[in-house]
UniProtKB/Swiss-Prot annotation:
The lineage of its organism: Eukaryota, Metazoa, Chordata, Craniata, Vertebrata. Keywords: Disulfide bond, Glycoprotein, Hydrolase, Protease, Secreted, Serine protease, Signal, Zymogen. This is Mast cell protease 8. It comes from the Eukaryota. Its main location: secreted. The gene is Mcpt8. PROSITE patterns: TRYPSIN_DOM, TRYPSIN_HIS, TRYPSIN_SER. Residues 21-242 form the Peptidase S1 domain.
């Protein structure tokens, strides 16, 4: 999940599912009740992503976390302790219509759950931003997710880390497709902490409002990272949520 850069990355196997939880800390159990653990599969394998509950029956995640079968677990902290958690299949997945699977531009998706989540102290929704909300360079916000430890074993517990928003030109120098109007440039290279592949789809939370989606499929040791800027997609989000919630 949270990556100590370059040397440790080189030690990971090519098919590693996530980064390493280095410089991150274990979250207080159920302190982030909006977190969703997502498992999905295609014809070849089963994968994991993060996500977050935005309505009782809708989870937001990255569009590249799509598969033939998707299941969401809510209210979970330790993946080995499923008691009192809610496992809900996804009935419909709607990725953004302009999502590019190669560049990961417009990497946002809404999942309709087969049934509404039961809200409690461990399961709750998170606030979405307004369209005009603009996360600025220098802001420090938090990412949470489940990923691999430094020894390449899977983390059983939810981990979190604080990351600093960077100026867009830092990401433009690394990616020709970076677009500051719809993406966020996240992670201070001098701090050597970041997100990895296993954190895809997870929330970037600033002052209790989700402002970004981890949009990193094959993360290398280079910082900063590119996240989806949620505020830019609010018209699409409102329209799609209304569509998914029709009787």
């Amino acid at each position: 999940m949270f990556l100590l850069l370059v040397l440790l990355v080189a030690a990971l196997p090519v098919n590693a599912e996530g980064g390493e939880i280095i410089w991150g800390t274990e979250s207080k159990p159920h302190s982030r009740p909006y977190m969703a653990y997502i498992r999905f599969n295609d014809s070849k394998s089963v994968y994991r992503c993060g996500g977050f509950l935005v309505a009782r029956d809708i989870v937001m995640t990255a569009a590249h976390c799509n598969g033939k079968v998707i299941n969401v677990t809510l209210g979970i902290h330790n993946l080995k302790k499923k008691k009192n958690t809610q496992l809900i299949p996804v009935s419909e997945a709607i990725p953004h219509e302009s999502f590019d699977n190669e560049t990961l531009v417009n990497d946002i998706m809404l999942l309709k759950l087969e049934r509404k989540a039961q809200l409690n102290s461990a399961v709750d929704t998170i606030a979405l931003p307004k369209s005009k909300d603009w996360v600025k360079p220098g802001q420090v916000c938090t990412v949470a997710g489940w990923g691999k430890l430094a020894n390449c074993t899977l983390s059983d517990t939810l981990q979190e880390v604080n990351l600093e928003v960077q100026k867009g030109q830092k990401c433009r120098s690394m990616s020709q497709t970076y677009n500051d109007s719809i993406q966020l440039c996240v992670g201070n290279p001098s701090e050597n902490k970041a997100t990895g592949k296993g954190d895809s789809g997870g929330p970037f939370v600033c002052n209790g409002v989700v402002q970004g989606i981890v949009s990193c499929r094959l993360c290398t040791g280079t910082l900063p990272r590119v996240f989806t800027r949620i505020s830019s997609f609010m018209p699409w989000i409102r329209k799609t949520m209304k569509l998914l919630q029709q009787p």
